[in-house]
Amino acid sequence: MLQPKRVKFRKVQRGRRDGAAHKGNTVAFGEFALQSLEAGWITARQIEATRRAITRYIRRGGQVWIRIFPDKPITKKPAETRQGGGKGAPEEWVAVVRRGRIMFEIGGVTPEAAKEAMRLASYKMPVKTRFVARDIPVVAGETEVEEAE
């Protein structure tokens, strides 16, 4: 499972998850992607389950890119423990995902296969998602030039 090799601080505050993703919100590596429609925490186990669902469906046909990494430790106090006595021990790792974040990408497969793989993957996610395809945007200032005959 994914987790950082080293961290500067063992325990972190919970933080806020509101707002849209400004980074990681475009398809960068593959042709198709799974995009988050809401904010949430995605655990390392959920990321691994999603990766397995995608790779099992596409077999050896394509390539998968995981665009999120669980770098936030979540602490938990033991069961039946009285409150106080400090913050609990780190229990699991999560990736903080905001609205619009690209989480997984696929390349080298047909659009139908990619859509089905992402549909299966979306069942493993705790947030609402959508299937997106790579668009080749026209750079500002450029216009599409038709070939002269």
Curated annotation (Swiss-Prot):
One GO-annotated biological process of the protein? translation
Q: Which HAMAP family match?
A: Ribosomal_uL16
Q: Does the keyword tRNA-binding apply?
A: yes
Q: Name one GO cellular component term.
A: cytosolic large ribosomal subunit
UniProt entry keywords in alphabetical sequence: Ribonucleoprotein, Ribosomal protein, RNA-binding, rRNA-binding, tRNA-binding
The record's GO molecular-function terms, alphabetically, read:
rRNA binding; structural constituent of ribosome; tRNA binding
**PROSITE patterns tied to this protein:** RIBOSOMAL_L16_1 (PS00586)
A UniProt-annotated Pfam family: Ribosomal_L16
Tell me the first and last residues of the signal peptide. Answer: none
- The name under which this protein is listed is Large ribosomal subunit protein uL16
Q: Does the keyword Repeat apply?
A: no
**In UniProt terms, what function does this protein have?**
Binds 23S rRNA and is also seen to make contacts with the A and possibly P site tRNAs.
Listed under subunit, the entry gives: Part of the 50S ribosomal subunit.
Stated family: Belongs to the universal ribosomal protein uL16 family.
Q: Which organism is it from?
A: Dehalococcoides mccartyi (strain ATCC BAA-2100 / JCM 16839 / KCTC 5957 / BAV1)
